[in-house]
């Protein structure tokens, strides 16, 4: 299998959990490299649906080691709840490891997150209110609490007493909120450390050993490319780096250790929260996509905004991540539509633009330029090969592959593992198209 990164190629919620689950059966190690409880994926265990926010999908495979990397921010309370849920269903959690240098989300982070968002008013970003941004802010300011701090009560107490004194100034003076008492928090988080002690390790050392032993490693990103702190639709982004490059920093390995990058994108586009969304549909088609796709956030429960597939941001995701291939999910959601549109470029103040603009104000002025393709108006959920697909559905996939110059390796047609078409080997199959010597494009084919 080699070492593979799975990234979201849109604004998150692309169905990475299912794709990671499919690939995890061939992995020896699965690593979550960034984000926190602001992301989530749904898994099914013994006919019961679980929503996990921190634990990698590979936890369902007893021989697969799962690592929460240093680039993540960990809410220990939520993590322990997830562990207990899995154990109650008979799923072993002994194979879960947590990087000792991962930062910890504290109660004051959640309070500050919610208070800041409320204070922004009409300028709100649309955060989940889970304290992720403030946790990463403390990490950057070098005042954060790390998992290793939870294992030394005296060290934890000293750090928390200082941190809480600083946060209380902000809570009281800026937001008019009641101050926090440090002692209960010290006791609570020290207890979390004891309960998690056996899971906390030097994550980079474990990964280095796995690499040297030629183990197959799967790196699992949260959110999506367009939510990346540096490369997304800033400021309407998350506080970490979901892009493929973030896997090396967040896991603690060198870039030469990555063999392949797989992007995941829906057959249409969704977005949660605020921010520009050129292909957003505020009509009955958008409602249909939301209803058929069950578009509600795993973490917040908020209804997702829905729109047509945006190949401009798709090409951007291919470029920023160096995608080798794509997995297209939820193709079945389009089954009822008589026609399907794909945004191939933007109109910005009367000029055609085929590239994603980094300026959020400019991006907000983008108007989609569409290509319209015929729909297939029949169910695809039973299809298990390309030959089973209606011709119009196959043509739609080919169009996406060509316009983004990247092969499609996987097509998902529902939530179940069986509702999947493996077009090409996602690990060893064809890679992204290159340019000919004369500069013309070599278009990838679907099969």
From Swiss-Prot:
Question: Could you tell me one molecular function GO term of this UniProt entry?
Answer: adenylosuccinate synthase activity
Q: Which GO terms describe its cellular component?
A: cytoplasm
**Organism of derivation:** Thermosynechococcus vestitus (strain NIES-2133 / IAM M-273 / BP-1)
- Known EC number(s)? 6.3.4.4
**Which locations, inside or outside the cell, does it occupy?**
Cytoplasm
This one is known as Adenylosuccinate synthetase
* Name of the gene encoding the protein in the UniProt record: purA
| GO term, biological process aspect, one | 'de novo' AMP biosynthetic process
| Catalytic activity of the protein | IMP + L-aspartate + GTP = N(6)-(1,2-dicarboxyethyl)-AMP + GDP + phosphate + 2 H(+)
């Amino acid at each position: 299998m080699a070492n593979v990164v799975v990234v979201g190629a849109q604004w998150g919620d692309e169905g990475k959990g299912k794709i990671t689950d499919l690939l995890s059966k061939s992995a020896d190690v699965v690593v979550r490299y960034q984000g926190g409880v602001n992301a989530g994926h749904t898994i099914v265990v013994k006919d019961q649906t679980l929503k996990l926010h921190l634990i990698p999908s590979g936890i369902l495979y007893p021989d697969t080691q799962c690592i929460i990397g240093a680039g993540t921010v960990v809410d220990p309370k939520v993590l322990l709840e997830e562990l207990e849920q899995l154990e109650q269903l008979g799923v072993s959690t002994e194979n879960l490891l947590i990087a000792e240098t991962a930062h910890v989300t504290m109660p004051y982070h959640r309070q500050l997150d919610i208070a800041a968002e409320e204070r922004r008013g009409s300028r709100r970003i649309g955060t989940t209110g889970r304290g992720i941004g403030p946790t990463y802010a403390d990490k950057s300011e070098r005042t954060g609490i790390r998992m290793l701090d939870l294992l030394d009560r005296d060290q934890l107490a000293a750090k928390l007493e200082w941190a809480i004194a600083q946060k209380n100034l902000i809570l009281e003076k800026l937001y008019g909120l009641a101050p926090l008492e440090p002692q209960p928090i010290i006791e609570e988080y020290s207890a979390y450390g004891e309960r998690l002690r056996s899971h906390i390790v030097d994550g980079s050392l474990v990964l280095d050993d796995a690499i040297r032993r030629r183990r197959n490693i799967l790196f699992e990103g949260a959110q999506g490319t367009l939510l990346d702190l540096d490369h997304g639709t800033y400021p309407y982004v998350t506080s970490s780096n979901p892009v493929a490059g973030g896997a090396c920093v967040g896991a603690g390995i060198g870039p030469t250790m990555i063999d392949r990058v797989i992007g995941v994108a829906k057959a249409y586009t969704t977005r949660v929260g605020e921010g520009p969304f050129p292909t957003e549909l505020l009509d009955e088609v958008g409602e249909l996509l939301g209803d058929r796709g069950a578009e509600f956030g795993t973490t917040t429960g908020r209804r997702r905004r829905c729109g047509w597939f945006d190949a401009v941001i798709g090409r951007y995701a291919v470029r920023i991540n160096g995608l080798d291939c794509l997995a297209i999910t939820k193709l079945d959601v389009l089954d009822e539509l008589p026609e399907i549109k794909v945004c191939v470029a933007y109109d910005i103040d009367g000029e055609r633009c085929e590239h994603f603009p980094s300026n959020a104000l400019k991006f907000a002025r983008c108007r989609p330029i569409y290509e319209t393709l015929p729909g297939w108006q029949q169910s695809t959920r039973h299809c298990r090969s390309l030959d089973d697909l209606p011709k119009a559905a196959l043509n739609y996939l080919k169009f996406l592959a060509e316009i983004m110059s990247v092969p499609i390796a996987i097509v998902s047609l529902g939530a179940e593992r069986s509702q999947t078409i493996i077009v090409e080997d996602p690990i060893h199959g064809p890679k992204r198209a290159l340019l000919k010597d004369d500069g013309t494009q070599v278009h990838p084919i679907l099969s």
